[in-house]
Amino acid sequence: MMDMKENDQKRNDMMDMKSHDERKNLNSSQGKNEITFPKVLDPKKDNNGYKSYTLKAQKGKTEFYKGNFSNTLGYNGNLLGPTLKLKKGDKVKIKLVNNLDENTTFHWHGLEIDGKVDGGPSQVIKPGKEKTIKFEVKQEAATLWYHPHPSPNTAKQVYNGLSGLLYIEDDKKNNYPSNYGKNDLPIIIQDKTFVSKKLNYTKTKDEDGTQGDTVLVNGKVDPKLTTKEGKIRLRLLNGSNARDLNLKLSNNQSFEYIASEGGHLEKTKKLKEINLAPSARKEIVIDLSKMKEEKVNLVDNDETVILPIINKEKSTNKDTTPKVDKKIKLEGMDDNVTINGKKFDPNRIDFTQKVNRKETWEIENVKDKMSGMKHPFHIHGTQFKVLSVDGKKPSEDMRGKKDVISLEPGQKAKIEVVFKNTGTYMFHCHILEHEDNGMMGQIKVTK
């Protein structure tokens, strides 16, 4: 049996062999398969005024490559899930059914609801069981999503297909495209690795965040988008386990950045590039009528084609942030990841905060001797405001309400955090393997 010194030496050797934040090469989409869009799940109205839904987590088969079927997971289907459309003021009731052969939860990422129905790892639904949750929508229009959060199997279940979008809409009039599936388009970007053209998380898992070599959009490999629309609104979700995305258009055309994770910006921005951390959402509007070309590519890091878009019609900065109330230190890699030097313990409350109290949190990605790696930090049950990064005002695409912030090694950010509901909420690194390995804590919000 390997003794402790040998085991430590083996780990050190492995650490020396790879960079902390190494990006696995991602192959460009060849534009062979037209993407489709998740169906909208229509609610039933009950006698008490609730919009009533049923979501089933289930096993399925998906033909990513012709003639090759992979074992996948989905909500109400083989892969991914339907889109839920809600409005502020809606009373919502959702029956959650676990048809898997393992525990799962249903987490409402970005939704400001009572901690008892947030769907964190303590709210397990066992195989063959179900439960019904109720809540009232109390936040403004935003693009959110839902996914499982069972500890320690979040990464595996998301990778195998459990993800879906949740829109909060309003009746405010604006000029943004709003025809779902026509010019208002949900875009779920993921990266996966296929073994013999089949999905196999076990063989490709990486404790520092599983990155694939194949891009998928809305569950399609080699995706493309063909449209006749002059303007299109892309609701972008980085649904990857660990990969950061730096997105721009291949023709260097600017687009309108209209919404962050928490909803519409007070003032839209003209940008040429945006960053999407794992789990992040951003909404952009692209004016295709300004294109000279028939095709433009949505690309990552200037080169990797994520989604070819075919236009069919053409064939001073000072840190003036307030006093810090809470400090969060993100440290480590592999399975040696911690928050404030501690692994996740479901029986431990790390922080408390009063409901509706405005606090300033300082989030630091601690740089280690090997320089460290990027960590996307997420808080359940709230949308926060980025006050500063390294003492300076946040970049344009970090403005607006957010629920995830990605920090480079050595970076330090201050965020303004307010909880509108009571309950126990999670905060964690949204590299899913890090989350499963204990890079997670709990905050209890009280009256």
Swiss-Prot record:
It holds the Pfam family Cu-oxidase_2. Signal peptide: none annotated. GO terms for molecular function: copper ion binding; oxidoreductase activity. It comes from the Bacteria. Binds 4 Cu cations per monomer. The keyword Metal-binding applies. GO terms for cellular component: cytoplasm. It is found in: Cytoplasm. This is Multicopper oxidase mco. It comes from Staphylococcus aureus (strain MRSA252).
